Each structure stands twice: as C-alpha cells, then as structure tokens.
Amino acid sequence: VTTATATWVNREATAEELIPLIGKLHRENGVVLSIHGRSLVNKSVIELLKLHDFVSHIDGAPLNPAHTLELVRALAELNLGACSINIAALHKAHREAGSPELSMWLPEQLGSSVNHQGDQPKEQDVVLYGFGRIGRLLARILLERSSSPLGSGLNLRAVVVRKNGDKDLVKRASLLERDSVHGPFKGVIEVDEENSTIIANGVPVRFIYSSDPTTVDYTEYGINDALLVDNTGRWRDVPGLEQHLNRPGISRVLLTAPGKGDMKNIVFGVNDNVITDEDKIVSAASCTTNAITPALKVLDDAYGVERGHVETVHAFTNDQNLIDNFHKGDRRGRSAVLNMVITETGAAKAVSKALPQLEGKLTGNAIRVPTPDVSMAILNVKLTKPAGSAEELNELFRRESIDGELRRQVGYSDSPEAVSTDFVGSRTAGVVDSLATVVTDDSAIVYVWYDNEFGYSCQVIRVLERMGGYDVPSYPAK
C-alpha cells in the first residue's frame, strides 16, 4: 500500500467518524455545521472530503478532516442551542489564536449558544402558492431542514395548486422527487392521495386545490399566522397579492418576482434590514437582481460606481417556446433550444430599489441561451476611484466571499476550467469568475455566474427567515 493510498484511507475513516457526529448535532441541537457556506449535514464521505479540499481555494490550503473531527467532538460536549457554525473559519480562528485548549476556547467563542440545548426557536408556518420550478426548489430547501426539529424554524405546511387530472398529486410528488437539472430529492417521498398529502422525510405537506386565492380558508387545515410565498408571478402588485393576505390563516406574503409600485423589493444581504413588522407584502426581486446587486454593492462601497451596463446571458425559462410558436413578447416566440434570443430585462433598473444610490446609473439587456439553468451577468462599470488592477479587484471579492457581510451572497471562483454546469446548486446569489475580470483605468468588467433557480431560491428562503423572525446565531462572529 502506497503512502498516498494509506493517507486517503485515513481521511476516509476520519470522514466516516464525522458523519454521525454532524448528524447528531443537527438533529438534537439544531446545529448546522458548514464549510464556507456549504453545509456538512447529510453529506457522504466523499462529499465531506471534497468540501475539505475546497477550502484551499479560499484559504490557500485544504482543511484537514482530523482537525474538523477534533473540533466537532469538542462542540458535541457543549450542549449547544440552535446555531450555524463555519468549521473552516472556526479552525482558522483557533489556529491564529495559538491553538489553545478547545474546552476553554470554544465556550468563549460560542458563549450565547453554550448550554442551550433544547431551546425551541420560533416556529413559522409556510404555504407555497404554486409548485413550479421555484416552488419545488423552495420545498426541497425547507424539507431538507426538517430532520432537525430544533433548527427548522420554517415549517412547510401546504402547497396551493390547480388540479390537473386524477393523478395530479402523484405527478407532483414525482416532480419533487426527480429533477433533470438538480438531481434527485435527498430523502424519501410518500403519497397519501386520500388526504391530498405528500409526506417528505416524514413531514406531511397538504396540497390544497384551488384556482382562486379568495376561496381558501387555511385555518381549516390547521394553518395559522402563515407566511405565504406566491411563486406563480401571476400577481405582482399589492392589490393582487392582498387576495392572499385577506384569507384566514395568512399573515404575510412574499412574492418571488419583481414587485410593482411601492412594494419593497428585497435583495437579502443588501437591504433586508428595511423589512419591518408592518410590511405585510414584500418582493424578493428577481434572480438576476439578486445576482448582480451584491457584487455592485461591493464595487460601490470600495470604489464608487459612476455608471454601468449589465448584460445577462440567461438560461431559457418556461416562458419561452420549445419550438417556434406565437409569443406576445418580441423574439421570445422563437425556439429556446435552438437560438440565442435577445430580450429585455428590468434587472439593472431594479437594482436601485435595493441600492438607491445607483438609480439612473445602470442599463441592461439580456440574451437567452439554450441551457436550462445557470446564467451569467457581465457588469461593465465606470468607477469613481480606479481599482488599480484586476488582482486588487479580485482580492476584494475573494475576501468578501470568505468573511464579508455579503459572504452568503457573493461567491468566488478561480478555476480556469469552470463552466456553467459547475455552478448548478450554488447557494450564493452569484459567483465572481475572477479569471475573467478586466480592469482598465477607471473601468472594470466583472463576470458573475448565478444559478438562477437554486441560488435565487436560497435568497428567497433567507428573506422568509427574516420575515418570520427566525434568526439563529452564526459563528465565528464577525
């Protein structure tokens, strides 16, 4: 047996020891362990080892699984309450502190969560109105958290859809279970047709059939004070969405599309602080606005943005035709799988709803391309203060992705082989492709990849958590 093989076998053995410890902390304490935003919960041995190697792209060297095991064993002794812990950042902080005794050092770092095991975080009922691409991904994210009764916070109770035939529920369960882009559902799904219920990972989700939001009484299903997520895009103004708000059992509404009028458009991480208890209807903006606004904020905070143009190379969507057919929009009637289609986007102008200082400074266009998921935004901006070099600008984004305020929104890639499918399942709003960055005098061009389905859905969940008052501590504290 070679030395390399023996080392690999030891790493596998260490990862195998980690799995039950990570699972127990999640189930019994509501603790979510992660590595720079990538959850360790329900991961296989190989997935855990790949996540440890990923750290080299951020910190310059991989994270040793043995160090993680030492940390996790120590964490398991602290009777922690629900919280989120970045193991890579915690290990780095421990090393920089001189590697003191963990039993003494960890309680100082996690003080507010130590000896709080069993504390029940605020629970919030959630209803999904619609079950399309975004609706099903929101359901997946909510259900993957359900294995921890102490850390779920948001409880998916029901989905409202129009009935399409006798096998409607079975087909919807199949669509939740299998996805051509995002792969199989991570869990077990059962169908209870008699009670119009899908049971996913032991969680019953009632399917309510209705084509009119004004006819549903949610209290009849034991649902009270719920957050309703309208992911149909059918209504985008306050009067339309108030149809939900006026129904028994619903207290607030979140729209997964750009809102019209005076509705607050929220890009989590940028302007979620403006949400108040009085805001009964809120928009989570669009996938593209969520992808570009955090990156633009980083640029504006550091250098100032005088003006700019945003070009989005966007995956095709359900709104387009498979083959040429009539469409009310210009060019969108042409085949989505055979053509690049120039179209309009309101994402650039919508940025100002989250960053008012950029109002009137941005223009935008979009090109729909024949790929089902993952898009790219090209930010071409004139800066008030020159960035100096591409290396300086990239370092700014790299640091932001590690420990900045926008680390959950801004990702960073330095791979010379990265292509669009590599970003399927990305949980950040956007990922800066550092090798494509161009800086010339006071101009900069930044390329941002984004999973326009899953990455956006993660942002929607974050807004939901803020609206529901679900806010667990994150460590290490910034």
Task: Identify the function of each model-found stretch.
Residues 2-49, 302-442:
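C-terminal substrate-binding/catalytic lobe of Rossmann-fold NAD(P)-dependent dehydrogenases
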Residues 2-321, 329, 462-463, 470, ...:
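N-terminal Rossmann-like NAD(P) cofactor-binding subdomain of oxidoreductases
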Residues 46-118, 364, 380-478:
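C-terminal active-site/capping subdomain that shapes the small-molecule cofactor and substrate pocket
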Residues 63-66, 129, 133, 223, ...:
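Conserved active-site and cofactor/substrate-binding residues in soluble primary-metabolism enzymes
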Residues 123-130, 281-283, 377-384, 444-450:
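Short glycine-rich or small-residue beta-strand-to-loop segments that form or flank ligand, phosphate
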Residues 139, 233, 249, 258, ...:
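Residue-level marker of positions within ordered structural domains that often coincide
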Residues 170, 174, 181-184, 233, ...:
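Glycine-centered flexibility motif
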Residues 205-207, 362, 446:
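Generic structural signal for residues in well-ordered beta-strands
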